[in-house]
């Protein structure tokens, strides 16, 4: 068997360096070969490890999947095998395995691969079981099946990502590729004698001399970085207002360090007379499962008894209360210390609310890795933190892996393959001159060319998203590479630097039968904008139109505000018009700044989700820019209906929106007259005039005044008069705020608020009735 010699060299290398390896087995009859390789691994590694943890991952455990697993299982009874489906891979976050066996006959979902490979320990091997390596990129996977949306079929899938995946396996060290019929495709070239291989000792860890946490806690650390983070977080015991920013690549023990720190803090706080509340939040509870695991480990090591109320709440001696809540919910309680893990995945507005409310906050975030945020979070957020005058700011960057040694070829392979290490172009003053002169070209990415040729521009493009957007997952890039209904455009300076990127999805063009199903409860994959328009506004014809949904638009942060986003949108509009599309649109978490950007570029708000996103704390909105007369009529109708619904739903559904944002949402480029006449009774007119001429209070005519203002909002013709401080009227009439709340929010006295309202209503009254 010509693989054994190379396999022994691979084992030798990973043992010596505490690195990891991959063995790709191509072909159907791999069972004897794989069982032999596993036996060799077991016999050698059992000398270094007490227990060899093995994980088998498959798409399912029935039919052919089950047959392959059971046939292998009967040959390797010397290993205890844990089994899991790819879709459940979140369950293994924080765990560590020595052997990974991935059934990849029909599976290649990038997010899952990222999660799974990152659980592999040093001196560990991942086995990829592939049907046919030579024709790997021709294979259809379940990822492709999930991508499809009407009217596309499986044969429309592009499969460029699969080519990249295959190509990268051929490029990196510590990877063997073996075909059961053709033999070795990729070998290990370095000479290394397995019998002489022994693991390197771990670097010596130095504990701080003046440490406050117990040695029992510190000795749970695996790296110097973890020790340094614990030492840094001892400062939480000081009286100062403080913020900590801890950033790391994946697999650096960040969450474990936070858990150990909380256990160390708890031990010391138990000696105080005060009751303490410690809050923990993250985009999902799964992000902090490792934190809780190490919190409990630290408490147990310190012999501290605790009560586990739920997996999200721990109480220590009725004195220290530690709990997890979702990002938007945690603001409901005052905490002595707040831990925010994977902070980059939480809306910036919520993070700013934390800073207003809490005196001691720990923000941590992954920089690369499948849930990475890129450099932007640490760079931009740290810049903001440093501007705060009343907080002491601490920062630490964790770089040492806990599962394996640095310079691991498999980590390098993973980051490169999934484009996790992408960086955008650096910009300088000469670039800014080109931008000022609009010396740039806009074009659709030649996706196949970039993926097949490993063009550096691909990483520059992806790097913009990593730099400018908080949440980036490998699936997003694979979707762009493979999905038939996704494409991307870039704005490239004349010197070749990419400065802006737009990821789009083709939507609409839906047939009558599918539309009828959508009117009930059918939700077609993709087609986000047509689906919402059909379901919420019952306008069937819109789904027949063809449009482009902007999935993401991003500019390199240093040159934001120079008009590049607007320039790209203008160019995209022209491209869509030339190619006979009916509209371009987008769906995004609404903030004042973002909505202003879209409205400035002539996009019209037509929908607002009825619920906030629990992670970002924002309502999702849909904006559309019509391209032709037919779509213009529909968008105008949608905009009127949306404005009517918003006005009448605010006090019930959107009561937590700020007045300024509501006013922004009600802006429209269209001229409307309300669909009804304002017919007031004689009594209503009498009370209104009594209020405006002063003998009666606002309260005596509040119902009529509100009717007037709503009519005024709906009316957008040219003869509409302007009124001052309209946000105040929004607060009173649409949000139903008391004068006390208006006074507090707008920082004016109550009698002044009453004067403003009366003055503005008088303007509206004179316009309507005089």
Residue positions per predicted region:
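Glycine-rich P-loop/Walker A and Walker A-like loops and their local beta1-loop-alpha1 context
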Residues: 2-59, 240-260
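N-terminal pre-P-loop "Q-motif" helix
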Residues: 2-11, 218-242
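Inter-Walker segment of RecA-like/P-loop motor cores
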Residues: 59, 65-96, 283-331
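N-terminal accessory nucleic-acid engagement/regulatory domains that precede
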Residues: 93-100, 105-199
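Conserved coupling/interface region of RecA-like P-loop/ASCE motor cores
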Residues: 155-202, 209-224, 383-427
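Conserved acetyl-CoA-binding loop-helix of GNAT-fold acetyltransferases
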Residues: 258-260, 552, 558-576
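Terminal substrate-recognition subdomain of acyl/acetyltransferases
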Residues: 300-318, 325-328, 337, 349, ...
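Conserved beta-hairpin
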Residues: 485-505, 510-513
């Amino acid at each position: 068997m010509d693989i054994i010699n190379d396999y022994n060299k691979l084992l030798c290398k990973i043992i010596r360096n505490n690195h990891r390896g991959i063995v790709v087995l191509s072909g159907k009859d791999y069972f004897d070969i794989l069982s032999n390789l596993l036996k060799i691994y077991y016999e050698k590694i059992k000398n270094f490890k007490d227990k060899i943890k093995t994980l088998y991952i498959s798409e399912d455990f029935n039919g052919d999947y089950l047959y392959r697993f059971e046939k292998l299982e009967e040959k390797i009874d010397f290993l205890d095998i844990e089994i899991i489906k790819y879709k459940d891979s979140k369950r293994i976050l924080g765990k560590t395995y020595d052997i990974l066996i991935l059934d990849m006959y029909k599976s290649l979902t990038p997010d899952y691969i990222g999660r799974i490979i990152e659980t592999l320990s040093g001196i560990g091997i991942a086995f990829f079981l592939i049907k046919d390596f030579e024709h790997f990129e021709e294979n259809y996977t379940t990822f492709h099946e999930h991508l499809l949306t009407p009217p596309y079929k499986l044969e429309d899938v592009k499969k460029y990502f699969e080519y990249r995946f295959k190509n990268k396996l051929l490029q990196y060290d510590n990877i063997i590729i073996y075909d059961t019929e053709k033999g070795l495709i990729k070998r290990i070239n370095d000479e290394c004698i397995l019998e002489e291989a022994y693991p390197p000792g771990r670097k010596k860890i130095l504990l701080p001399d003046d440490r406050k946490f117990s040695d029992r806690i510190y000795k749970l650390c695996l790296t110097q970085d973890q020790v340094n983070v614990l030492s840094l977080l001892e400062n939480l015991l000081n009286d100062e207002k403080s913020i900590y920013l801890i950033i790391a690549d994946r697999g650096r023990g960040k969450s474990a360090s936070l858990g150990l720190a909380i256990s160390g803090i708890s031990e010391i706080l138990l000696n105080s007379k005060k009751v303490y509340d410690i809050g923990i939040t993250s985009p999902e509870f799964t992000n902090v499962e490792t934190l809780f695991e190490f919190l409990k480990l630290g408490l147990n090591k310190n012999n501290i008894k605790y009560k586990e109320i739920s997996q999200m709440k721990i109480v220590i001696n009725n004195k220290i209360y530690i709990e997890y809540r979702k990002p938007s919910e945690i603001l409901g309680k005052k905490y002595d210390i707040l831990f925010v893990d994977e902070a980059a995945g939480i809306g910036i507005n919520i993070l700013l609310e934390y800073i207003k409310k809490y005196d001691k906050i720990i923000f941590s975030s992954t920089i690369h890795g499948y849930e990475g945020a890129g450099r932007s979070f640490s760079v931009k957020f740290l810049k903001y933190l440093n501007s705060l005058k009343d907080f002491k700011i601490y920062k630490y960057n964790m770089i040492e892996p806990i599962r394996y040694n640095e310079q691991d070829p498999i980590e390098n392979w993973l980051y490169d393959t999934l484009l996790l290490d992408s960086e955008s172009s650096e910009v300088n003053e000469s670039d800014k001159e080109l931008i000022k002169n609009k010396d740039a070209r806009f074009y659709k990415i030649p996706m196949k060319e970039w993926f097949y040729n490993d063009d550096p521009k691909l990483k520059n493009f992806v790097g913009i998203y990593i730099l400018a957007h908080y949440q980036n997952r490998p699936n997003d890039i694979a979707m762009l590479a493979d999905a038939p209904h996704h494409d991307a455009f870039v704005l490239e300076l004349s010197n070749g630097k990419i400065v802006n990127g737009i990821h789009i999805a083709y939507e609409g063009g839906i047939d009558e039968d599918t539309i009828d199903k959508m009117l009930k409860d059918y939700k077609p994959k993709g087609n986000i904008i047509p689906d919402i328009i059909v379901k919420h506004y019952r306008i069937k014809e819109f789904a027949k139109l063809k449009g482009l949904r902007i999935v993401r638009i991003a500019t390199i942060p240093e040159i934001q505000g120079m008009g590049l986003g607007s320039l790209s949108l203008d160019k995209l509009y022209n491209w869509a018009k030339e190619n006979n599309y009916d509209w371009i649109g987008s769906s995004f978490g609404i903030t004042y700044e973002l909505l202003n950007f879209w409205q400035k570029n002539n996009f019209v708000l037509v929908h607002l989700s009825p619920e906030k996103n629990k992670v970002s704390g924002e309502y999702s909105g849909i904006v559309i820019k019509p391209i032709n007369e037919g779509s213009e009529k529909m968008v105008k109708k949608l905009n009127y209906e949306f404005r009517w619904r918003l006005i009448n739903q605010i006090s019930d559904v959107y009561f937590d929106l700020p007045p300024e944002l509501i006013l922004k949402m009600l802006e429209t480029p269209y001229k409307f007259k309300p669909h009804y006449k304002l017919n007031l009774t004689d009594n209503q007119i009498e009370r209104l005039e009594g209020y405006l001429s002063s003998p009666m209070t606002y309260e005596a005519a509040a119902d009529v005044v509100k009717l007037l203002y709503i009519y005024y909002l709906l009316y957008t013709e040219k003869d509409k008069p302007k009124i001052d401080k309209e946000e105040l009227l929004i607060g009173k009439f649409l949000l139903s705020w008391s004068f006390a709340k208006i006074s507090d929010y707008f920082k004016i006295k109550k009698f002044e608020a009453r004067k403003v309202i009366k003055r503005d209503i008088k303007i509206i009254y004179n316009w309507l009735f005089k």
